[in-house]
Amino acid sequence: MVKNSFISVISQEEEKEENRGSIEFQVFRFTNKIRRLTSHLELHRKDYLSQRGLRKILGKRQRLLSYLSKKNRIRYKELISQLDIRESKTR
């Protein structure tokens, strides 16, 4: 069920080649990497280098999401609902 939604999102994004640098596409790619690393770490709990990589990718995605929420709140809400991500906490 989740894979189908990602396939539809990526097919929409890949139709427009010029949008590969867009924030939405970057967040989508980071989310896929995060989900792959999370499933890998469920099997290999002591893979500390992968844990570090996961934390770095999480930070990058968080920075992009915070930038998007400041610049365009509507696009941010749509992206979060499409990718099934929790909304970040505001300080």
From Swiss-Prot:
Q: Which InterPro entries match?
A: Ribosomal_uS15, Ribosomal_uS15_bac-type, uS15_NS1_RNA-bd_sf
Task: Give its localization.
Answer: Plastid, Chloroplast
Q: Which CDD domains match?
A: Ribosomal_S15p_S13e (cd00353)
Q: Give the primary localization class.
A: plastid
Spell out the Gene3D superfamilies in the cross-references.
S15/NS1, RNA-binding (1.10.287.10)
- Does the entry feature the keyword Endoplasmic reticulum, yes or no? no
* Highest taxon of source: Eukaryota
Indicate yes or no for the key word Ribosomal protein.
Answer: yes
**Which BP terms does GO give this entry?**
translation
Gene Ontology MF term list: structural constituent of ribosome
Pfam families from the entry?
A: Ribosomal_S15
Q: What's any one GO cellular component for it? A: ribosome
Keywords for this protein: Chloroplast, Plastid, Ribonucleoprotein, Ribosomal protein
Q: Which family does it belong to?
A: Belongs to the universal ribosomal protein uS15 family.
| Oligomer status and interactors | Part of the 30S ribosomal subunit.
PANTHER family recorded for this chain? RIBOSOMAL PROTEIN S15, BACTERIAL AND ORGANELLAR (PTHR23321), SMALL RIBOSOMAL SUBUNIT PROTEIN US15M (PTHR23321:SF26)
Q: Which NCBIfam families match?
A: S15_bact
What is the name of the protein in this document?
Answer: Small ribosomal subunit protein uS15c
Q: Which organism is it from?
A: Eucalyptus globulus subsp. globulus (Tasmanian blue gum)
